[in-house]
Amino acid sequence: MSYAIFKHGGKQYKVVEGDIVLLDKMNKEPKALVELVEVLAVSKEGKLSFGKPFVNGAKIEAEVINEGRGKKVITFKKRRRKDSKTKRGFRRDFTRVRITKIVA
């Protein structure tokens, strides 16, 4: 089984062909093709190769499925006896992609 580890938006993802991954928003239309070139490691036919920092000539081809927003996460801070509190919400914008091909 071949897999790859790539970096996108400050995070690292381990994927195989056919996986569906939520990435940071990329402003792409559905069915658009995306190339992810910051590949840190690739395993093909049992042979593992690491990059310094990226693997030369390696890329991951993916197809955009859709874009959306995640569930709301609420942060709440309260300081006792001061009637001081803060409530803040955050929703992550994401792009859902399907990994179609790992090129090494």
Swiss-Prot record:
Part of the 50S ribosomal subunit. Contacts protein L20. The keyword Ribosomal protein applies. This is Large ribosomal subunit protein bL21. Belongs to the bacterial ribosomal protein bL21 family. One of its GO terms (molecular function) is structural constituent of ribosome. Keywords: Ribonucleoprotein, Ribosomal protein, RNA-binding, rRNA-binding. SUPFAM superfamilies: L21p-like. The keyword rRNA-binding applies.
